[in-house]
């Protein structure tokens, strides 16, 4: 994700959505085999980008809580 603006202290990692949960939450298995709970970023909600199980996504993780994240990109 070279063209996206980098935020300080945020970890970006790829993963695969394994399960869709209520309230636009998703369970994502990261490339390092960890499983995190993630929600959709505001820009993705604004543009009605749909996320389905088995989609490859980019997740932003905060260094303070590595079990929760934000989905910021869905690969086509």
UniProtKB/Swiss-Prot annotation:
Give the chief site where it resides.
cytoplasm
The segment(s) forming the S1-like domain are: 1-76
InterPro entries recorded for this chain?
NA-bd_OB-fold (IPR012340), RNA-binding_domain_S1_IF1 (IPR006196), TIF_IF1 (IPR004368)
Q: Has the keyword RNA-binding been applied to this entry?
A: yes
Write down the SUPFAM superfamilies for this protein, in alphabetical order: Nucleic acid-binding proteins
State whether keyword Repeat applies: no
Q: What are the subcellular locations of this protein? A: Cytoplasm
Going by the UniProt record, its keywords in alphabetical order are: Cytoplasm, Initiation factor, Protein biosynthesis, RNA-binding, rRNA-binding
Give the record's GO CC terms.
cytosol
Lineage: superkingdom: Bacteria
Q: So where does this one cross the membrane?
A: none
Which Gene Ontology molecular function entries are recorded, alphabetically?
ribosome binding; rRNA binding; translation initiation factor activity
Which Pfam families does the entry mention? eIF-1a (PF01176)
- Briefly state the protein's biological role: One of the essential components for the initiation of protein synthesis. Stabilizes the binding of IF-2 and IF-3 on the 30S subunit to which N-formylmethionyl-tRNA(fMet) subsequently binds. Helps modulate mRNA selection, yielding the 30S pre-initiation complex (PIC). Upon addition of the 50S ribosomal subunit IF-1, IF-2 and IF-3 are released leaving the mature 70S translation initiation complex.
Question: NCBIfam families per the record?
Answer: infA
Q: Which family does it belong to?
A: Belongs to the IF-1 family.
Subunit (UniProt)? Component of the 30S ribosomal translation pre-initiation complex which assembles on the 30S ribosome in the order IF-2 and IF-3, IF-1 and N-formylmethionyl-tRNA(fMet); mRNA recruitment can occur at any time during PIC assembly.
Q: What is this protein called?
A: Translation initiation factor IF-1
Per the UniProt record, the lineage of the source organism begins with: Bacteria, Bacillati, Actinomycetota, Actinomycetes, Micrococcales
| Gene (UniProt) | infA
